[in-house]
């Protein structure tokens, strides 16, 4: 399970180093294979260990190619999807179209989301956190049925 936020750097070749604490589980459970695609709701990337991505692909396979919305979702997620592999130094290469989509430059945030990671431009991440705090403070949280009995 992936949790926590890590500040990392994008090198001049477009690579990032996955933090050491995640490398062993990625290597042992997923042979170091990761699929990167776009988040369709935010300007960030999603990094799925290969076995998690295969579950997403199975869901996408069930979507209709004749329904415009479903086809659009498939095009975005699959069209941007790139499979990468951790190198010997725990790095992965982020393809240019993905870097452009998420406006990734030098400073990046890798954010664990249990079964996947989000990859954000550092400034966009800080702005997103502010927006999340606003949402949590608003009545939207109190009025959300699925969160009615959620307790920490």
Swiss-Prot record:
Transmembrane segments: none annotated. SUPFAM superfamilies: AbrB/MazE/MraZ-like (SSF89447). GO terms for cellular component: cytoplasm; nucleoid. Keywords: Cytoplasm, DNA-binding, Repeat, Transcription, Transcription regulation. GO terms for biological process: negative regulation of DNA-templated transcription initiation. Belongs to the MraZ family. This is Transcriptional regulator MraZ. It comes from Shewanella sp. (strain ANA-3).
